[in-house]
From Swiss-Prot:
Gene3D superfamilies: 2.30.30.30
PROSITE patterns listed in its UniProt record: RIBOSOMAL_L24
Molecular function via GO: rRNA binding; structural constituent of ribosome
Pfam families on file: KOW, ribosomal_L24
Gene Ontology terms: biological process: translation
Family: Belongs to the universal ribosomal protein uL24 family.
GO CC annotations on file: ribonucleoprotein complex; ribosome
Keywords from the named record: Ribonucleoprotein, Ribosomal protein, RNA-binding, rRNA-binding
Protein name: Large ribosomal subunit protein uL24
InterPro entries in the cross-refs: KOW (IPR005824), Rib_uL2_dom2 (IPR014722), Ribosomal_uL24 (IPR003256), Ribosomal_uL24_CS (IPR005825), Ribosomal_uL24_KOW (IPR041988), Translation_prot_SH3-like_sf (IPR008991)
Length: 104
């Protein structure tokens, strides 16, 4: 998967099309990413008491994972780009922007 935790991405399709956000978590086995402020859902949680007596629960708004094919990585110029790879001088794979050839 070419999108990693900490990348800035833009949503290219779906209800949040055009939204930018930072990848909070990546799920490579499921090909999904959790993006900050994107694909927000309302989750209904059961009301429960904590040990101090306070109540927690109700309707909670949180981000849901979005498929990796619906996002594109934003390069250093702030434009969405595809991701490529090249071998660096130290022999390690380095991610590059396909749009301008710079390192991501």
């Amino acid at each position: 998967m070419k999108v990693k935790k900490g990348d800035t991405v833009v949503v290219i399709s779906g209800k949040d099309k055009g939204a930018k956000g930072k990848v909070i978590q990546a799920f490579p086995q499921r090909d999904k990413v959790l993006v900050e402020g994107v694909n927000r859902i309302k989750k209904h949680t059961k009301v429960s008491r904590t040990e101090r007596g306070a109540q927690s629960g109700g309707i909670v708004t949180q981000e849901a994972p979005i498929h990796v094919s619906n996002v594109m990585v934003v390069d250093s110029d702030g434009q969405p780009t595809r991701v490529g790879y090249r071998i660096g001088e130290d022999g390690k794979k380095v991610r590059i922007s396909r749009r301008n050839g710079k390192d991501i």
